Amino acid sequence: IQLAGNLIHFMTSETATALSRAVAAEPAKFAEAFWGRAPLLSRAGELAGPAGFTDLLSPAAVDELLSRRGLRTPFLRVARQGTVLPASQFTGGGGAGAEITDQVLDDQVMRLYADGATLVLQGLHRIWPPLIDYARQLGAELRRPLQVNAYLTPPGSQGFSTHYDTHDVFVLQVDGTKRWRIHAPVLADPLEKQAWGGRADEVAATGAGEPAMDVVLAPGDALYLPRGWLHSAEAQDTRSLHLTIGVRSLTRY
């Protein structure tokens, strides 16, 4: 894995300041033992940097984005019980004479949220200053392009069924608690064109079995998942807000 060598050669615990907020391991150890190989759970007390992640995105910031920033699709998705809802259910026009037709309607969004839907704020590395800065620093340390989404889930709800991503993921738990069930890959190191939907039956069958890891993330905890690892996540008895940082893989394909 090329990144492992890059991390070992270029990074130390002093220079990898963004990475040290997401993994409780020295860069060389992370590169050799976990990157692209195995999940890594890091509890809040083990991580460097500020306590928690509310400096990057807080519940109040989510409220501001939804209600005061004129957010448009595709910067918001809404999902419930494994299904992504049509944008027409929560968007509308920008007012008389305006050509905008996809502006987020916060009252409709909150109606769906109250009915158990998960709100997915997408592309925050482009629109929210603290995450613009953090993503730029982490991307420079990893030497990889990345993206940042946020997931706000009501108590006891699950937005997506078991699936895998075709990019590596850092999960940063901001608020509330969320239970993650993680299973080994059905396809090792999937490429971007090898999305989980093409193996839906195999993914579902594997997801119904005993997980390789079953953990509850609390505020300030972080979880690293290599691409291809199956996962599902369910909010516990309070709402859950977490950040997902997706790191794209650079391959010859």
Task: Please place each PLM-identified region on the residue numbering.
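N-terminal amphipathic/basic-hydrophobic helices that include classical n-h-c signal peptides
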Residues: 1-10
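Active-site region of the double-stranded beta-helix
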Residues: 10-25, 29-33, 48-221, 229-253
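Conserved beta-strand-loop-short alpha-helix elements that form
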Residues: 224
